[in-house]
Amino acid sequence: DTIKSVVAVMTESSVGSGFIVSSDGYVITNYHVLQKGGPIRILTYDKNVIPATLIGIDNLRDLAVLKVRGDYDYLNLADSDKLQVGRKVIAIGNPLGLSFTVTEGIISGLDREGPNGIQEYIQTDVSLNPGNSGGPLIDTQGQVIGINNFKIGGAESLGFALESNSIRDSVNAIVGKN
């Protein structure tokens, strides 16, 4: 059932991934998926295309909060302070337009520094490709431990996800303003 809370996020010029974090339709994705602008739509697991409204962004952490109408199954954010290197994880996303693709791997490192200079990233060997951005990195209990954000080009198995505690703080700040 975890996969039912993952969505494809689409604009006129880009496609990425996202996930639902509340029953009333809040969706999290990476801001860079939306950055070129245009109307935002999401594709649900049951093949519905729904317009989405941008609620707010955290540019530093490359996060965006969207809102869609309806009632949804959603994913919970885990406590990323409890993560351990070597734990099994899965990524669900939309790599190269292949909707709802599932890949697996492990947590390779914690507290890695991202291109933004903050040490809030999980290193993983999960296969991440263009279109995976904004999708969840999930533990074996089906909870989100991170949002897939970037990979190191020219290297294999060097993917990075913003940790769930940072997501929670950012989303609470964004939603609290609206």
Language model regions located:
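A short, Trp-centered hydrophobic/proline-enriched beta-strand micro-motif
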Residues: 1-12, 17
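Gly/Ser-enriched beta-turn/beta-hairpin loop segments
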Residues: 2, 55-62, 110-122, 153-154, ...
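Short, acidic/hydrophobic/Gly-rich beta-strand patch recurrent on exposed beta strands
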Residues: 8-10, 41-43, 64-69, 105, ...
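Conserved active-site neighborhood of the chymotrypsin/trypsin-like protease fold
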Residues: 13-17, 22-100, 117-118, 168, ...
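Catalytic nucleophile loop of clan PA
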Residues: 19, 128-148
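Short beta->alpha transition motifs characteristic of CBS
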Residues: 30-35, 108-109, 130, 146-153, ...
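C-terminal cap/linker of serine protease catalytic domains
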Residues: 52, 144-178
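Short pre-catalytic strand/loop immediately N-terminal to key active-site residues, enriched for Gly-Thr
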Residues: 73-76, 122-129
